[in-house]
Amino acid sequence: QVYNWIHDSIHEVIHMNYKDLQNGTLFPQAITEFLEWCGEEYIFFTWGNQDVMELQRNMKFYNLLELLPGPVTYYDVQKLYSISYDDGTHRCALEHAIDELKIEKSKGFHRALADAWYTAEVLKKINNIIIINHPSLDVYQNPKKKKDEIHISYPDHDKYVSREFATRERIMKDREVTSTRCPVCHLPAKRKLRWFMNNPKVYYSISNCEEHGLIRGKIR
């Protein structure tokens, strides 16, 4: 419906060409039926942090974004695997995780159903407490009003998703955005190093909690 061909580099990964898709279900029908199948209560589990955003981008293109209100909470199994078996920051390929966990490779990779099955197999190897404590939030659809803002507490940090601001200056004048609380005791921390820019999109600061020590703040 949008592209008349598949780029060679994509073809090498997914081993499909445009002819394979000609008899497929059109996206508006596919996403509508998929969300109906999901029902009222569902949670997305993905491998990586791009799938939920790309899904919403496609839905927006077809004027169907109202079917999936955001921001969308989901669980990134790639991140959960790193927290469980690596350093928490490194992100590995799905096949690498399958090899490390000695899960049988009975299907090919880079196909939707097969990768979903492998992701579920990795998920089975992760402690439920780690899963529950580390939700991800896709903000392709940002909060529009103060009442819609989101606060999430993780074991080692807090996340605050604010409403949209018209300018950078307004962001940095907002007290709640620029304040810092300790992620352990949740009390206000004393600023040690004022907010500074690391690049045009990110600000950092250093604050101190008398009981729990130094805290790095980040605004992006």
Where are these regions (language model features)?
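Active-site-proximal helix-loop-helix substrate-binding element of RNase H-like nuclease domains
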Residues: W5-I14, Y18-L21, L80-A116
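Acidic, Mg2+-coordinating catalytic module of metal-dependent nucleases/exonucleases
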Residues: I43-N49, E54-N58, A93-H157
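Acidic two-metal-ion nuclease catalytic site recognized across multiple nuclease folds
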Residues: K125-R220
